Design a protein with these regions (language model features):
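Membrane-interface helix/loop caps of multi-pass membrane proteins
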Residues: 1-157
Length: 157
C-alpha cells in the first residue's frame, strides 16, 4: 500500500499576503508602490510551484498524472465562481452604466474560454485605461492561469 502525504506549504500564505497587499496598493495609485506589479509575478511563481508539486506528487505515488482528474479539479475550482460572477456583473452594469456593455459578448466568451488575455492584447486594451470600460479586465490573470493549468501536465508528461 502506498501512502501519499499531502504537503501544505504554510509559509506561502504569508508570501501571498504580501503579494496581495503590493497588488492592491499598486492598483490604488501606481506611484505609491512602483514595484507593486511584482506581486503578480509572485502569485504566478507560487501557482507554478504548487501545480508542479502536486503533479510530481501524483507521479511519485505511482498514480501517474491522471489528466481527467487534474483538469476536472481545476475546472470545479474556477468555473463555479466565473459562472456566478459574469451574469451578476453584467446585470449590475445594465443598471449602473450600460456603456460598460460595449463588446460584452466577446469579453464573456473569452473569459469563459480562458483566453481573455489574448483578446485584450488583440484589441489593444490598456490595463489602466480609463477610456475603454471593461468589466473583466482583471480576469487576464485567470486566463493566464487557466492556460498554465492546461499546459502544466503536458510539460511534465
Amino acid at each position: 500500500m502506498i501512502v501519499v502525504v499531502r504537503r501544505r506549504f504554510v509559509g506561502l500564505n504569508g508570501l501571498k499576503g504580501i503579494a496581495l497587499i503590493a497588488i492592491v496598493l499598486y492598483h490604488c495609485d501606481q506611484g505609491t508602490l512602483r514595484g507593486g506589479f511584482f506581486g503578480v509575478d509572485i502569485f504566478f511563481t507560487i501557482s507554478g510551484f504548487l501545480i508542479f508539486s502536486s503533479l510530481l506528487n501524483h507521479i511519485d505515488s505511482g498514480k501517474g498524472i491522471g489528466f481527467k482528474e487534474y483538469y476536472l479539479k481545476r475546472l470545479r475550482r474556477i468555473y463555479p465562481a466565473l459562472i456566478l460572477m459574469i451574469p451578476v456583473t453584467v446585470s449590475l452594469a445594465w443598471f449602473i452604466n450600460q456603456d460598460m456593455l460595449v463588446g460584452i459578448k466577446n469579453q464573456m466568451v473569452t473569459v469563459m474560454l480562458g483566453c481573455y488575455n489574448w483578446y485584450a492584447i488583440g484589441s489593444g486594451a490598456s490595463y489602466f485605461s480609463q477610456m475603454n470600460p471593461d468589466m473583466f479586465r482583471h480576469l487576464w490573470f485567470m486566463s493566464v492561469l487557466l492556460q498554465f493549468y492546461l499546459l502544466a501536465p503536458l510539460l511534465i508528461y
